[in-house]
Amino acid sequence: MKRSILALASGAFILGAAEFVMMGILPQTATAMHVSIPAAGHYISAYAIGVCVGTLILVFGRKVSPKHLIILFMAIALVGNTLSAVSFCSPMLLVARFISGLPHGAFFGTATLIAKTLADKGKEAQSVSMMVMGQTVANMLGVPAGTLLAEAMSWRLAFAILAAWALMTIVVVILWVPSIDPIKDAGIKGQFLFLTHPGPWLILLAVFFGNSGIFCWWSYVSPWLQKTGGWSATMVPMLMVLAGLGMVVGGIVGGRLTDLWKAGATAALSHGIALCGLLLVFLLPSNHATTALLTFIIGFALFFNSSPQQLLMVQAGEGGGELIAGAAVQIAFNFGNAIGSIVGGAALTATAMNYHFTGIAGAPISLLAVILLVLYTRRYEARA
């Protein structure tokens, strides 16, 4: 892996860990902030809302070097994670999580452009997948480590370490990432012209619905494993490693398959796998074997679609809208996360905390993603 891509992957690691670690430490933060588990799910939603708002940075940063934008995003991540580590009440943690989410979509939009620009010809999707790999490694190692720290010491330590990592990443980005020219300045309106076509909207809606469905379940994976799977709290970090391994494998397979096959079809396949997994959460009897298997499968599906969807949108935005297009995927992804967390929490409240229903609540939403991507593939990729 090129050092420049490694530096970008380090940033992706921070943002991935900051976003997903909350799923593993939700019970501890709920206890510390004196709120219920469904109410603590709002910490996930706050991050996701920050992602959506933070993309506005790109609208006004279009004339800035992408490298300098990456440094800015890491500085914001440093502030957000520091505040999360020292939060003493629920409103403060909500604000801290919002700030932590601000750089997320903008980072991935910018980093995707850099990775694509620095890639060897014909290996653009693999280069993007290597950058995104930082996020998948965060899920395989960072999230379980954070969960373990929360069990053994304090959930605050996880955010403190992420803040220190953000500072280190600023240094390696300065040293290793080459400066590339800003994208063509198409003006504020020009950056959004790609959204006048239906294709990008099909992709974005698919990302939104696909992740809404998955996060109905994933937002509550830690208590699901314990309450329905019978796993002890000390085993949850190991199961987070299993989920992260699924994400890493999914990211690698998705990147390679996208370069060899059609990106839209690859993304449709990934959401189909997630749909099957969510149905099985509801249908299969809960025991150690089934919960572990489903944790791996749905984790695999979650990052199988990252590279194809990210690449499709950056290509759709060519001509001045690449940064906004790349960030738009993360907006849809995280807006989906926020809605999924809320829907999953509502399902739990309505069923007296029956965690099986997080799967059946998410399945029909994921089905919409499959339908949208099949439509996209037939309309745009069948001609290729």
What are the residue ranges of the model-derived segments?
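Helix-breaking motifs and short loop linkers at transmembrane-helix boundaries and internal kinks
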Residues: H34, V86-M92, G230, L284-S286
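Conserved MFS/SLC helix-loop-helix module at the cytosolic interface between two early adjacent transmembrane helices
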Residues: V53-P91
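Helix-to-loop junctions at the C-terminal end of transmembrane segments
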Residues: G54-P66, G250-K262, L348
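Paired small-residue
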Residues: G80, P91-S100, A289-I297
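Helix-loop-helix hairpin linking two adjacent transmembrane segments in secondary transporters
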Residues: S90-M92, K121-V177, Y220-W224
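Cytoplasmic helix-loop-helix junction between adjacent transmembrane helices
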Residues: A96-G134
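Intracellular juxtamembrane helix-capping segments at the cytosolic ends
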Residues: A106-A119, F304-E318
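A late C-terminal transmembrane helix in Major Facilitator Superfamily
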Residues: A316-M353, G362
